[in-house]
Design a protein with these regions (language model features):
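Low-acidity, Ser/Thr- and Arg-rich intrinsically disordered low-complexity segments
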Residues: 3-12, 17, 22-24, 29-34
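Anion-binding alpha/beta catalytic cores of soluble intermediary-metabolism enzymes, centered on
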Residues: 36-304, 308-374
Length: 374
């Protein structure tokens, strides 16, 4: 916003001192620059967001700059983690192409961790993977130090991380490691602009091959994920209704189309329900009709469950993206801090063209601000 340019108070913005295991792109060239901060926000540093800018070959910078152009000026200004020179280049190149405004990097506060080499839009590799890995790690450090109260992450490319030597399935697993927890859960949430109803879908398994899903669906895992989903939904309703999707067609057809429902899911759900009578638990339901009520609730035509447990990645993401592609937010649960991200990828095919839509990033930032205060 234009009001951010009228800044009077200077604040030092430096990377945190971290153990030697913290990755660095080029420590000798880290020319950190401080940005001014509005007087009204000077005492609100712990209430602001930290935003890692994602893979520099993707659309992360574009959607962040577009989202910040619409960020309410009365909210604390987020702290960005990335490369200033690269961000300024993106702004210069994208501004004439973009149909919507972009925030001027000159008015934004940023921890500057420079890129060691030029990155071309759409061409991810070891250099871009090393950068996005470092930026994420530094953004987490800012949250853990209390300088920010929530983390928003722009998309990264897993193959770029792997090329840089960072063998993680995704950002969620890296966040769990940095936080010192065994795992974090992926929840996708969106609020219908038509009805106000909130879609909440949690994944029982995440980035694993489909062939590995049945073996991963232990009773303990399913019950653990239900605990996480119920706890989140109880923020909004004390006695929530949860729905669990089946794994097989027709939810196994009483064991005729697969035994996972009979042998694992149904006993696990019954035992969990006995321990949690305050929650209405339904399932396992046939996956092809499990989210029908969600579609009606999104349109304002009916009520639906407060939360859905999907058993594998695409089972949960297909209904989420059909209903709320531009509004959905990925929220990591089970961490000691709040993390959200947009529900889309790096967008390499459209990087550098100025046409990326920022609604999901805007929703991720708004959700982080809302949930961190809940």
């Amino acid at each position: 916003p234009a009001s951010w340019s009228r800044r009077s108070q200077r604040s030092s913005t430096q990377p945190l001192r971290t153990p030697a295991t913290r990755p660095r792109l080029n420590p000798a060239s880290s020319n950190q620059r401080s940005m001014s901060t509005p007087q009204s926000l000077a005492n609100a540093k712990g209430e602001r967001l930290a935003i890692s800018l994602g893979d520099p070959a993707g659309i992360g910078a574009e959607v962040v700059l577009k989202a910040l152009a619409a960020w309410p000026p009365q909210q604390p200004a987020p702290l960005l983690v990335g490369c200033r020179r690269w961000l300024e280049q993106c702004y210069t190149q994208l501004r004439p192409l973009s149909p919507t405004p972009l925030a001027d990097p000159a008015n934004l506060e940023l921890i500057d961790l420079p890129l060691p080499e030029a990155i071309r839009p759409g061409e991810a590799g070891a250099a871009s993977g090393a950068a996005s890995f470092l930026w994420l790690s530094e953004a987490v450090a800012q949250v853990q130090a209390g300088r920010c109260n929530a983390l928003v992450t722009a998309p990264i490319a897993k193959h770029a991380w792997h090329a840089a030597g960072h063998r993680y399935p995704g950002q969620t697993e890296r966040l769990a490691e940095l936080a010192g927890v065994a795992e974090a859960s992926m929840l996708f949430t969106a609020r219908s602009p038509r009805s106000g109803w909130r879609l909440n879908t949690l994944l029982a398994t995440t980035h694993i091959p489909l062939a590995a899903v049945p073996g991963a669906l232990t009773a303990e895992r399913v019950q653990r994920k239900l605990d996480v989903l119920a706890s989140f939904c109880q923020r909004f309703r004390p006695r929530p209704k949860l729905v669990v999707a089946g794994l097989n067609p027709h939810a196994g057809e009483a064991g005729q189309l697969g035994r996972e429902e009979q042998d694992t899911l149904i006993p696990a759900l019954e035992a969990w329900q006995q321990r949690n009578p305050q929650v209405e638990l339904v399932g396992p339901l046939p996956p092809d009709t499990c989210w029908l009520d969600a579609g009606r609730a999104w349109a304002g035509e009916a009520d639906a469950a407060d939360g859905y447990l999907a058993l594998y990645h695409d089972q949960g993401l297909i209904p989420v993206k059909l209903l709320a592609f531009d509004q959905a937010v990925n929220t990591s649960l089970g961490l000691p801090f709040l993390r959200t991200s947009p529900d889309h990828g790096t967008g390499f095919a459209i990087a550098g063209q100025g046409i990326a839509r920022a609604e999901s990033m805007q929703a991720a930032m708004a959700a982080a601000q809302e949930l961190s205060r809940a």
